[in-house]
Amino acid sequence: MVIRGRAPLRVSFGGGGTDVAPFCEEQGGAIIGSTINKYAYCSIVPREDDQIIVHSLDFDMTVKYNVRENYVYDGRLDLVTAALNAMEIKKGCEVYLQCDAPPGSGLGTSSTVMVALLTAMARWKGVELDGYAMADLAYKVEREDLKIDGGYQD
């Protein structure tokens, strides 16, 4: 069985930066943007052991976790570590990640990868998250848990 998550990248036409605190909290914000037909992908293949093996195809990197240990941020695929913690994943699996655009492209890649990850994990766990709940969770994980700067549009 393969569980998949996919999320579209986005382009901002104007207003970028007005969605970043504290500006948006004090002044409000408005952005004109759209998703595009480029995506971040996540595939999860359950395993029968206690290992989580993550393959980042874009970074040509593999990271392993043991579900019996705490998932610790170590600078290697911390987006995945944060998603595992947020979704409380405690079953073995292989995770495959790929994105149609490179990090730093200005298309919201890290947030898009996070949404693809969380979508696949939620499907695997049988957790229903509507678009707003998914956006809130992805924002919390990236901005609050990982302390990654960015706005709401990401």
Where are the predicted features?
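Short, conserved phosphate/pyrophosphate- and ester-handling motifs at nucleotide-, phospho-/glycolipid
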Residues: 110
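ATP-binding N-lobe of GHMP and related small-molecule kinases
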Residues: 1-107, 119-131
